[in-house]
C-alpha cells in the first residue's frame, strides 16, 4: 500500500496532475518523431532575402534550407515529416497548437539557437538545447 501511494505521488509529480497531463498529450496528437536543428543566420531570411519575424517562419525556412536548398548546419538533423513541402506549410499552425515558451520564441527570433522539435500529428513542441 505504501509503495503504491508513493508511486502515484511520483507519477503525479512528473506528469503534473494526472488527468491534465493525459489531456495535454492527447491535444498534441500522436507522437511522430523529433529532430534537432541549429537556426543559423541564413534561416532568418526567406528565399527572396526578406527577414523573417516569427519563430515558426524561421523553423520552416530551416527545413526548406535543409531539404530544398541543401543549406545545412553541422548540427541539423533530418526528419521525415518536414521533408515534404505541403507538411512544411503546416508548421505555423502546428506550432500554434503546440508548445514553446516565450524564452524559446525569443531565442529563435533574436538569435541562432540549437533547438529540438518534437513532431506530433497535429502540433509540435520546440525546446531550447543551447543558445
Kindly label every feature range from the protein language model.
Residues 26-27, 97-111:
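Short, solvent-exposed secondary-structure boundary motifs
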Residues 26-63, 113, 123:
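Charged, low-complexity intrinsically disordered segments
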Residues 1-9:
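Bacterial N-terminal signal peptides that target proteins for export
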Residues 5, 43, 86:
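Solvent-exposed, flexible loop/coil residues
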Residues 49-104:
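Mature extracytoplasmic domains of secretory-pathway proteins
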Residues 18-27:
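Sec/Tat signal peptide C-region and signal peptidase I cleavage site
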Residues 106-130:
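Short, exposed beta-strand-loop hairpins at the edges of beta-sheets
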Amino acid at each position: 500500500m505504501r509503495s503504491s501511494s508513493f508511486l502515484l505521488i511520483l507519477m503525479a509529480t512528473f506528469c503534473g496532475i494526472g488527468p491534465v497531463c493525459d489531456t495535454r498529450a492527447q491535444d498534441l496528437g500522436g507522437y511522430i518523431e523529433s529532430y534537432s536543428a541549429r537556426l543559423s543566420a541564413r534561416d532568418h531570411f526567406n528565399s527572396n532575402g526578406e527577414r523573417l519575424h516569427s519563430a515558426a517562419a524561421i523553423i520552416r525556412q530551416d527545413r526548406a534550407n535543409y531539404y530544398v536548398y541543401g543549406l545545412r548546419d553541422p548540427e541539423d538533423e533530418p526528419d521525415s515529416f518536414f521533408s515534404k513541402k505541403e507538411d512544411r506549410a503546416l508548421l505555423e499552425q502546428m506550432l500554434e497548437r503546440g508548445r514553446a515558451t516565450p524564452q524559446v520564441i525569443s531565442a529563435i527570433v533574436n538569435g541562432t539557437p540549437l533547438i529540438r522539435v518534437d513532431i506530433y500529428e497535429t502540433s509540435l513542441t520546440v525546446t531550447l538545447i543551447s543558445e
